[in-house]
Amino acid sequence: MFTIEQIKDILVEAKKLGTVDSISMEGVEPFLFYPIMVRAVEEAVKLGFRVEVLSNCYWASCPEDAKVWLLPMAENVELSLSSDFYHGESWQIEEVGNAVKAAKELNMKVEILAIKYPKAKAPCPSDIEGAKVGLYDLMYKGRAASKLAEEADKKSWREFTECSCEELVHPERVHVGPLGYVHVCQGISIGNAWQKPFSKIISEYDPYENPILEPLVRGGPVALVEKFSLPHDEFYADACHLCYAARCLLRKRCPDVLGPDVMYGEFE
């Protein structure tokens, strides 16, 4: 997990760039590290950042308790809450409803994120307790590639000639993990913020100098497969699925770019 000093370092470095206006705390579950998360919010707000927190709401056992969890950051945080069949047994998870009720009472901005689920018998609701629900496609990378892709509808691998999920030439966001890796897409590292200042990593970013990003920018996952003459299946669920499968085969050849291990399902 991050230390407070590491978080402060990233925030200060991000401020130096002059192009970053918002910080999102997500991945795993931020509320599992509650005191660190609250402090991180405070530090981000001091520097003038807009702050978003993404959560599955395991902590919202009832609206009253949810208010206690949210109160220390109610004035400074926008909430994005996950509610779908990948996080519960229905589109509308009880704990998410509790969190929305609490957030509304505290005048917090809140939205719901839901991922399409092909086996759902009922349509996804347009709102939960008055909070708008955004419905998004599942991206088949990471665990989704290994656990869910087998049952997905598939297309020819040759159709995936661009990366539609991330802007790789002029990124509008990056992901920073507790090991310091800076990713333009989860699992594709452009540097390590514990080894090189974050602001320098971003200011010196050039996808055409990166062995993995160069083909992805030029022709998507298809170009990545062709550049390295990788073995492949004929059909994949989406571009992320093909890209992830290709990157798994390239990890030993590009260890500085394709890491850390946890991004590829490897745990010590």
Q: Residue spans of the language-model regions?
A:
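Radical SAM enzyme [4Fe-4S]-AdoMet core and its adjacent flexible, acidic
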Residues: 71-208
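Core AdoMet radical
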Residues: 1-2, 19-33, 47-62, 73-95, ...
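Short, acidic/polar
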Residues: 3-11, 62-70
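Flexible mid-to-C-terminal extensions adjoining Fe-S/redox cofactors in radical SAM and related proteins
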Residues: 193-268
